[in-house]
Amino acid sequence: MTKKIELAQIRVLFLGIWHFLLHLRRRLVEDQINIRAGHLAYVTLLSLVPMVAVTMSMLSAFPVFKGIRGQIEGFVYENFLPAAGDTVQVYINEFVGNASKGTAVGIAALVVVAIMLISAIDKSLNNIWRTKEKRSVVVAFSMYWMVLTLGPVLVGASLVASSYVISLKVFEAEALSGMLPIFIARLPMLFSVAAFLLLYMVVPNQKVKFLHALLGAIVAALLFELGKKGFALYVTQFPSYEAIYGALATIPIVFVWVYLSWMIVLLGAEITAAMPEYLDYESSSDDETALNAKPLADASQGDSSSVLTSAEVTALKAVAKSE
């Protein structure tokens, strides 16, 4: 009897995962995340130079970040633009240098284009969450401006704090010396989880549960790390883009990677948004199942006052059918 109930609970668990995946698949098809990712990739490439220009300007305003600007650039390009990071860094730094020499009107235009990217991200994620209530123009602009100005500062502060922790003498001890390479290797993964978690909790214009956002962030971060390694391996081992495009190969490589990155970001958002929908549906189904199965549960337990969980009810049904 106990073994049958345990097997039934395992079946319920895997069946629940399967039903969630089916629900997620329907959501992905309905939301057309491939089209959304393409739109965001286009806006990202259009806004890339303005975003970098604004970011570097914000970091330059704080003397503490001037000495580590090269480290910040290297960390970003190495971990977020695999296989083409060095080439892209050279071009973007040149473009940013040219952009910084522009007039006040030109710099204002760069800020507007950078805000366009943040606005596109905001609209895409809120559409995934089926958010009906929109933010006011003042609130939306304030949030975009805060992300644009405080975002680079927070990233720089995180890297400074990480560098400080790594330089502590505590890591020089023999017992902890082996932990340093592991910590450094896991640092990009930790940053990815933190960034996705913040994105999924702050951007939607509704309350998002921490555990749901954490699940989506972990899945997105894992896919992002695997995607970086897989894409870098493909570009280096199968240089078809270089054979076709020659010196212009960097352009399609960057576009494809940005597109894949947005697919991963939106997939994590879909997982986060689908969790409460699925759990609410399962809860209502469990209540109905428990109500219909009460006579069977009473007959099996011999106690009319017993309260059974949905898994126990399902298990008892399976036992009753087998008997």
UniProtKB/Swiss-Prot annotation:
Assigned GO CC terms: plasma membrane
Record bears the keyword Glycoprotein: no
Membrane topology, record value: Multi-pass membrane protein
Record has Iron-sulfur as a keyword: no
Keywords of this entry: Cell inner membrane, Cell membrane, Membrane, Transmembrane, Transmembrane helix
Compartment list: Cell inner membrane
Pfam families noted in UniProt: Virul_fac_BrkB
Transmembrane segments: 4-24, 45-65, 102-122, 137-157, 182-202, 213-233, 247-267
Listed NCBIfam families: PRK01637.1, yihY_not_rbn
Similarity remark: Belongs to the UPF0761 family.
Name this protein carries in UniProt: UPF0761 membrane protein Sbal_0315
Organism whose genome encodes this protein: Shewanella baltica (strain OS155 / ATCC BAA-1091)
Organism phylogeny: Bacteria, Pseudomonadati, Pseudomonadota, Gammaproteobacteria, Alteromonadales
